[in-house]
C-alpha cells in the first residue's frame, strides 16, 4: 500500500511542488485546485484530477472540488476516499467509458458533484461506474445527459441517495447483483428505457430497498414488450422492498417485477402508465402489493403467468382508477383493474372506472386457490370475471360490492368467452367456484 512518503515522492516527480503536497497533508482536506485543476481550462484534466483523487486517498482526507466545469474521464478509485463538490462543481465527460469508475474498493463517498455527459452523446457511456464495491455512498449529486446509463453498479453495497438524474439515454440507475443497495429519495426524469433497474445474473437474494424516489417520463426507445419503459424494474432479484415512490408517465409499467421472490410493493403513487401499472410476472412468488394508488393506466395490477410458475401473492388495500380503453404501446393489453391467477388473496381493494373488467380471476386453466373478498368494484364494464375453463382450479368470491357495472356484475368465462352472465345465480353449475355474500348494486 502506498504510504505518505511514497506518495509525496511520486507526485513530486510529476512536477508538483513539495509545498503543495505538504499543504495538502497539513489541511483537513485536499483541494483539487492544488493539483492544477482549473475551471477556465476547457481541455482534458483527467490526469490532474486522478492525482488529486490518489492524494486524498493516500492522505485519508476528503477531496474538495471547487465550483466550475472540468472535463475528465476514466478516473479510477480503488481504495477509501471521500470526494465533495462545492455547489456548481461539474465533471464533464471526456473521451472514455465513464467519468468515475469505482472498482474493488470500499468506504467511498461521492457527495455534491454534477456529472455531465453532454460531450459523450453518440457513445454508450456511463457517468458513474461502480464494480465490486462495499459501503459506498453516492449522495446529493446530479447526473445529466448520459449517452448510456447514469449510474451502473455491479455487486455494490451501499446507498444512492438524494440525487437527481435526468435526460439519460438508457437507464438512470442500473444495479446488477447487488449486495443490499439502498436507492432512496432520488429524482429521475426523461430516461430512454428505464428509471431504476435492480437485476441479477441469476435468481437469488438481493435485499435492495427502493424508497421515496420520484420517477417521471420513462420512454421505451429500445422497444420490446415490457423489458423497457418501466419506472422501476426488478428482475431475478429476491427480497426487494419498493415503497413510497412517486412514478408518473412510464411507457410500460410504473413497477415491474419479473421472476422475483418475496418482493414488497407498498404505498407507491403510480400515474399514467402505458401498460400494466404494477406487474408481477414470469415465475414470481411471494409478492405483496398493498396500499398503492394507481390513477391512469392501460391495466392496474397483474399477478399472473401461472403457466410460467407465477404464484403466491397478496393484493390488498390498493386503489385503481381511471384506466384507458387501450394501451398506447402494447396492443395485446386489454383494460382490467386487477388480474390474478394462483395461490393469492385479493382483498380490500377499490377499483373504479375500468372500461373492461374490474377483477379478472384466472385465464383458461391457469387458476388455483384464489380468494377475492371485501373489494369495492365500481363503474366497470364487467365487475368480476372468473375462469371456469376445463382444468381451472378453485376460487372463492365473497363479500364484494359491485356497483354500476356497464354490462355484467359477476361472470364466469372460458378464456375470453362469457359462459354465465350472472354467476351468483348460476354458481351451482361450476364446481371450481364458490360465490357468497356479494352485494350487486
What positions do the PLM features span?
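C-terminal segment of N-terminal export signals and the immediately downstream linker at the start
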Residues: 1, 21-34
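Short glycine/acidic-rich loop motifs that flank beta-strands on beta-rich extracellular proteins
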Residues: 72-75, 87-88, 93-98, 118-126, ...
